C-alpha cells in the first residue's frame, strides 16, 4: 500500500510539473473556463492548451464538460489550491532566505566595494 501511495504521489506531482499547467490551475480558482479562454489568457495555441489540460484531466485534477462546440474545464478537487498555496509559501520563504543571504554578503563587503567587484 505504501508503494502504491508513493507511486500515486509521484505521478500526481509529475502532472503538476509544468509552469503552464500550474498557471492554468490558478486561473481555474474562480471557476470553469473554456479551452479558448485559457489559450487566449496564456497566449498559447488551443492545441497546446488542450494537451496540457489533458494531462491534468487524465490525473483527475481537472474535469471537462462539453457544451456545444465548447469544452469547459474546472477543478475536480479544490484541495489542490492548498497545495498550490503551500508551494507559493515555500517559494516566498526561499526568496526571503536568498534576500537575507544577499544582505549579509553586502554587509561583509568593504565600503565602496560591491560583491560583483570582488568576484
Segment roles from a protein language model:
Residues 26, 51, 69:
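Base-recognition residues in the alpha-helical recognition helix of bacterial helix-turn-helix
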Residues 34-36, 47, 54:
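Residues within helix-turn-helix
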Residues 8-16:
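Short amphipathic alpha-helical boundary/capping segments
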Residues 57-67, 74:
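Beta-hairpin "wing" of winged helix-turn-helix
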Residues 5-8, 20, 67:
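N-terminal positioning helix adjacent to the helix-turn-helix/winged-helix DNA-binding module
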Residues 17, 68-86:
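Short, cationic-aromatic polyanion-contact patches
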Residues 1-5, 27-33, 37, 41, ...:
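C-terminal regulatory/oligomerization modules of transcriptional regulators
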Residues 22-24:
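Pre-recognition alpha-helix immediately N-terminal to the DNA-recognition helix
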